[in-house]
Amino acid sequence: GKLCLSEMLFIMVLFHASPYKDFKHFYIHGVEGEYRQLFAEVPCYARFVQTMGRLLLPFALLAHCLRGEATGVYFADSSKLAVCHNRRISSNRVFAGLAKRGKTSMGWFYGFKLHIVINHKAEIMAVRITPGNTDDRKPVPAMAKGLLGKLFADKGYISKTLFDQLWKNGLQLITGIRRTMKNYLLPWLDKILLRKRFIIETVLDTLKSTLGLEHSRHRSPVNAFVHIFSCIVAYGFKTTKPKLNTAIQMWDYP
């Protein structure tokens, strides 16, 4: 059996929207089972996985097309994408030369980082995938290209160089301050929005917990990136997204 490109894309998005946590079980019991009537022909699981690589570019383009609305209020953050358990780092061959050891507040991991920028409606504006040891601030200029307004982030994004670079392009970086730093005055609405950074943590939690973004069963780097981008596309199609207090959205801001 053969599937056209759109059917393969649909299957990947359907997986993220389904209750299945494992793609193999989803394909065998879902695609070849309860959803079988949706497709004229269905190849076996092994054949589908062999041809998944061709979906990478279409999914990357789809993710770009589902980009959120330019609202002037944005949030930036990153999250780890571990590709194996720490005990198996030395034996991992699938991502050799690609994945790197990184560290978060929860400890060390081996894999990649997903960097993300969203607007205040929790719509994804930009994503970047980097090795796990990449500084969170490094991808921000490329991700923020074309964005105007204010970008809220945590203390890990503090950088005068980054602030100046974004400021020249019409985007103000607003972060919390470290204990050793001198306090500075912020407009009250900026202070409120800085405290609302949990919205991007909610988006990352939705990607990981609900849509199954992170797992350690990948057998191919290309298929791993297909999985990541299909997850981002599935999120873009979600009709219900986290929201900030509507009273804040009513302000003509920034």
Predicted regions and their residues:
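Short alpha-helical elements
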Residues: 1-254
